[in-house]
Swiss-Prot record:
This protein's name: Vesicle-associated membrane protein-associated protein SCS22
Entry's Gene Ontology molecular function annotations: protein-membrane adaptor activity
GO CC terms, sorted: cytosol; endoplasmic reticulum membrane; plasma membrane
Domain free text: The MSP domain is required for binding to the FFAT motif of target proteins.
Name of the coding gene: SCS22
Amino acid sequence: MRIVPEKLVFKAPLNKQSTEYIKLENDGEKRVIFKVRTSAPTKYCVRPNVAIIGAHESVNVQIVFLGLPKSTADDEMDQKRDKFLIVTLPIPAAYQNVEDGELLSDWPNLEEQYKDDIVFKKIKIFHSVLPKRKPSGNHDAESARAPSAGNGQSLSSRALLIITVIALLVGWIYY
């Protein structure tokens, strides 16, 4: 299994949603099933997060960074290193005639039963941070901020929280 690229960079501004793609290429002779896991499931949505790739075929995986609250400091982002783990398993002979949908839903059992055949590959995530600008003397820093929601949170951080909760509820984010 090849993963292109081997690392992802989400570009600033980090308080906005952004999307990157990885390509999973099955360079083997057997079909494989894969699952994508993340160390930060509330910050990312992955589609598809589990799928089957035929021999010598590839799949593009969409990774959506949901954005961070404006209060997150740049140095805090530098210290956090989000990661993705791509878990792959060649489809066992006993499952060759099983329909794809059933195979995908049986992933937890496959993972437990064939744990010695599983291959793990990590993808590191990096966030590019814009250089800090010095405020000019004529502009009021308060006027440059997003409108307040009334409780100290900006509307954008509230919207990100709502999107994350909805994503969790409809099953966009898997562990």
